Amino acid sequence: MNWISNVVPPKVRSFLRRETPENLWVKCPESGELVFHKDLEANLFVVPGSGYHMRLSPKARLANLFDEGIYEDLPTPEAPVDPLKFRDVKRYTDRLKEYRAKTEAQDCVKLAAGRLEGMEIVAAIQDFDFLAGSLGMAAGEAIITGMTTALNRRAPFIIFTASGGARMQEGIFSLMQMPRTTIAVQRLREANLPYIVVLTNPTTGGVTASYAMLGDIHIAEPGAVIGFAGPRVIEQTIRERLPEGFQRAEYLESHGMIDMVVQRQDMRATLARLCSILTRTPRASEAA
């Protein structure tokens, strides 16, 4: 114990020990800019200076999407857990428990239904923070359930993708979700219901090779990485240097792979306009 401990009263010492919250300031990965967390939250986690789009939680994204932030949580069917009894450094079941506790979600896909400028829509959000948003049986079932709900309600289906690809711990059962979700997309198409994909950072692997690139309209957030294999793998395969910005949203837009790149602040209005055009339904703002 030093002399300060003897001189400074206990109440003052407890005030001095009060810690600053860990997330009070957030550093931009692109520019290094420090942003006050509340300012970042108010700006939908887009860094004001650099325009870098950070990850947005499913709850925050849904609250921003639906009218007045009001929506209906849609249940998802239970899927078999760990059919292969997979284990690497730790058991797959232990990994699931860990991520469920961390994210307070059963898996990486969240479903919701509600109104977007007065129009009924069904939405799905992939959460990259849950096992890198990987596509497994639970995620596949959730996406198919969302599309089926859109069919039953005759509503547009919007999905926000964020994934590292198929979930390796589920092997062939994970890969099966690619054709299964593709069939569900085809059912939407046959019913003449809009299917809009919003590609967020990153969207890669088996997700890109299936439902993420089968939309009627493909939108991407600025700077999003979108592709199948990583650039290093491609360069080693073709033995050539890839162009600057390869697999970024802006590069894909300029080469006709996606339809538009939209700032997060403008996403809600853009989606409402597209749903209105595709369903020939006036928006609430237009009706007023």
From Swiss-Prot:
Keywords: ATP-binding, Cytoplasm, Fatty acid biosynthesis, Fatty acid metabolism, Lipid biosynthesis, Lipid metabolism, Nucleotide-binding, Transferase. Residues 24-288 form the CoA carboxyltransferase N-terminal domain. It catalyses: N(6)-carboxybiotinyl-L-lysyl-[protein] + acetyl-CoA = N(6)-biotinyl-L-lysyl-[protein] + malonyl-CoA. GO terms for biological process: fatty acid biosynthetic process; malonyl-CoA biosynthetic process. Signal peptide: none annotated. Belongs to the AccD/PCCB family. PANTHER family: ACETYL-COENZYME A CARBOXYLASE CARBOXYL TRANSFERASE SUBUNIT BETA, CHLOROPLASTIC (PTHR42995:SF5). This is Acetyl-coenzyme A carboxylase carboxyl transferase subunit beta. It comes from Methylocella silvestris (strain DSM 15510 / CIP 108128 / LMG 27833 / NCIMB 13906 / BL2). The gene is accD.
